[in-house]
Amino acid sequence: MDISKTLYRYNAFDGNPEMFVRCSFSFYTCNGTLAVCMYRKPSHTMWIPDLYRLCSEPYAKITCNIPASTLLGYDEQFVNENDMPEIGAWLIVNGIAKPTGKYLVTEDGLLEAFRFVLPRNVYAEIKKMRRLMNTEPPSLREADNSKD
């Protein structure tokens, strides 16, 4: 949906060289919750301005789509550090997301929820999708019902 205009330096922590990435914010089609991906821009292609439009595959999916995601706010999502060690710290250092203090224990390990700094249009789109799919966060659903 939206690829951030900021180009971040990212070290994959797996022996690969440092690369340049941009974040993409979208939503999972099954429940409308926030989906965050990283798109790679190899350093030897830095001179190509619209490379991201040519690349359709993300380097990495930062968030994970699980049923408990519907309990989180519109701008929150669980981050899986099993596949990308240290990604939580990287998100914080670069000002992309902040920890919420919410955790979920799964068979794959402990997942931490983060609140992402989203562009307004992305936030509005996710809010709209979650209303359409009836997967709004419970606290917001109760607040809307109390207004009636």
Q: What are these regions, as identified by a protein language model?
A:
Residues T6, S24, T63, R115-V117:
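Ser/Thr- (and often Asn-) enriched beta-sheet segments in non-cytosolic proteins
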Residues N80-M133:
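Short, compact, well-ordered microdomains
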Residues N145-D148:
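Short acidic DE-rich linear segments
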